[in-house]
Structure formats: structure tokens, C-alpha cells
Amino acid sequence: MIYHNPVLKGFYPDPSVCSYNGKYYMVCSSFQYFPGVPLFESSDLVNWKQIGYVLTRPIQVMLDKINSSGGVFAPTIRCNNGRFYMVTTNDTTHQNFYVYTDDIYGEWSEPIYVDQGGIDPSLFFEDGRTYFMSNGADDNGVGGVVQCEIDIATGKKLSPSRCIWQGSGGRYLESPHLYKINGVYYLMAAEGGTEYGHMITCARADSVWGKFEGNPKNPVLTNRNKAPFIIQGIGHGDLVQDEYGDWHVLSLGFRQQHIWRPYHHLGREVFLTPVKFGEDGWFTCGNDGTTDESYEIKGDFTQNEQRVFTFANTSWDKEWCFMRRPVMENYELSDDKAVLHGSDITLDDVDSPTFIAMRQRDFNMEMTSTVKLTGSAGAVGGLTVLITENEHYDILLEKSESGCKAVLMLNIGGIKHRQNELPIGGDSAKFTIKADNYGYSFFCGEVQLGYGSTKYLSSEVAEGFTGVMTGLYAARGTAEFTGFECRYN
């Protein structure tokens, strides 16, 4: 069967995967969005269905007033003796922690913290022992992939933290994962930074503590020299073996807006690449160490992709998410409408505005909804495409003493520009946002209010590690949204 990359589109970076009872489970980073750490299930590694989130209670994760790209990132999921563990970093508090569950479809535990610094933590289980690793500095100040043994029940360290590998020489060593395959310990990591120089490297040893020998052909996977090619930034991966005994790596990567336009705004997505072990015991990935647009995988199934999203066919506790620590009393959500009671907090604030959103999953998109606004002068409500509090485009109804206007606001680098406005004879309007690789066109009814370039919502310009979110928003009044549809062409 031929599948096409990415296997999960939109801002779902830092994938980690494990298998249990014939199913595969994957988690991704969520940063400042809540609930945290989206959780997916698959039976074939290609079709992924979101089954919930790992961090669903504010007590599990503190996200109050954190900047964009802060919060929770680089999770790892593992299963040991039927219990699932998710370990991650909360950059807000500079702490590594894990949670667990015995029911993958249920709630997860309160966080258990580990007294080892660094970021991108991972777990490895063997013979009743648990090893915790991250990239940082060990107890002697030596930097690299750092490992200690822990008590999995309490998180307490049972050994000193020791640097076990310093990488192959690339900058920003991160994303360590340890595997035991055919009696050999393989340590996989990412280097080069999560941009165009991103890569996956590996080392191996005869002991869990090393000494680890780097693969002489490192990196084992990178698209840094694959040009002109739309898929770039491949790195931060996790190995998984399928039911046929074949190995694969799930990694992040991104799609440029065009092969000659080095900007990406959809965020880092999930790519699946085959892995082969050679007679020398080293593994290679993809096409001579690169990730391509399509591959063949064993299995009798069809690659499916949801192309239309409505209130009725999405779940408020799955596809949708909020910003930081939402005030849930401000939301009334049902199968046919959403009512948002706006506060004084706006999208420009490093706070929790009344805002609910989904990831933008592809370049060609059309999002539409009828918006009805109630409130006094200064109330606003409408649709937005947002990557940070400083970079977002908003088509809004705005209340004034003289009535309602439809306004188009472009926010670029913290500079606010009112591109256009249109008086409305009432308190409701139908808004549409049409997107392609290069820009967003904004409509009130049949009238185009303006246009915003995708370039300014890209990671290269806006900076950070997230991707564009398509959302509903209200401030200083109440906005009712009906007839919502987000369609990918």
C-alpha cells in the first residue's frame, strides 16, 4: 500500500510513539495550548485518530501567562507492563515530569517530577529498572544526553545523572530515545536545530550506560541538502516496529509554501519514514537518509483524511483547544453553535482570551461562519488565523455607538493595521477566510475586505515553534457562531 506524507497534517510537532496490543499510540507537543499533549491511536501507522489529550486538568500543567512557544513540548509516550507513561517538559516551570494511566482512553495521573534538568525527556524500561534521559548537563556539568535511573513510582533518582553521549557534532543536541534491538542499545537523537538543518543521528552500545559509539554515517535522516524540495526540517523522531517486523521512524518536518519560497506557516507536522537495518547492525532511514513524499508500507488499508470540519463532526475535547488557562464559563459549545462570552483579554495579550481553535491542516482552506455580536461599544467577535499574540489576522464584527462594522485587522510583529472596515446593517454577518499557500483572503458576505500574506505568519518571520491556528474569538461582548465549516480543498 502506498501512503503519502505527512501522515498527520498541521501543527503536531515532536511525535513520539509506542505500540500495545496491536495498536499504536502517538503524542505531540502542544506548547501554550490547553488541553495539553494531543493523543492519537492508529492500527497501521498511517491513519491517526485523536482519542483525547493527556493533560486535561489545570492542576497537571501550569500555563498561566506564558509566551507563545512556552509551556509543554517534546513529550515521550511509553508502555510498560500495560501502563502508559507520558514524560515531558513544562518550560514555564523548567521542570521535567511524567504522568501515567492504565486506561489509554481515560484520565491520566497527577504529575510526578524528576530532579534532572534539561529538556526533551524520555524513558527506557528494562529488567524492572527505569532509566530517565534528557538533553542537558549531568551532575558534573558535562553537557549532552544525560541519564539516570529513577524509581518509577515516585520519580526519585536512584543514580547520579551521567552524560552518556554528546552527539555527532551538530548543534542543539536534543530528543534522545533509547531502544534495545537484537541485544544492542541504540540511542537516537536530533541535532542541528528544528529548522532547515535538522537531522536525526544515532549511536549504539553494549550497555545501557555506554560507551556509545556514533554511527559513522550520521546523520541517518535529514532533508537539509534535499533541494528543491517542499519537505524540510526532518528530525526529532521515534522508532517503532510494525506487526510485520518492519521498522519505521515517526518524525517531525514541515512543508514550505513552495520549493522556492522558504517559509512555513502550518507548523511542524508528522512524517513516516521506513527504516532498514544493515548487516553491520546500523540502520538507515528513507531514501539514502532522506524523507520523501510517499512510500510503500505493508498492510491492506486506505489512507483516509478528514477534509471538512464542522461543529457536528468534531469534538470540543479533541480537535479543538484553548489558549493557556481558559475560563470555561465563557464558552457554550454544542453540535450546532458556539457562544463565546468575551472578556477584556484580547488576542494581543499574553493571557487567556476567549478563543477556541483548531490547527490549520493544509494550504488550501476555506473557513466560514455566521457571527452574531451582542454587547456595548468596543465588543468584538469573529474569525482569526493566529500563530502568536503578535502575529494574527482577524475578521471581526465590532460594536460602536453608531452600530456594527465588519473590520479586518492585520497584526504583524505587534504592529496593528486596520486594513478595511464595512458598516453592517444589523448585528450579524457571514465571514469567510479563503487560504492558499501564499495568503489569506477575507470576506464579509460576498465583499472582500482584504488580504494577508502567509509569509508574516510563518515560523521564519513570527518565530517560535507552533503553527497557524484557525479559530473563533470574542472580547468585551458575546459572539454566537453558527453554520461553521472549515473545508480543505
Range-by-range predicted roles:
Residues 1-489:
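Carbohydrate-active catalytic/glycan-binding domains of CAZyme proteins
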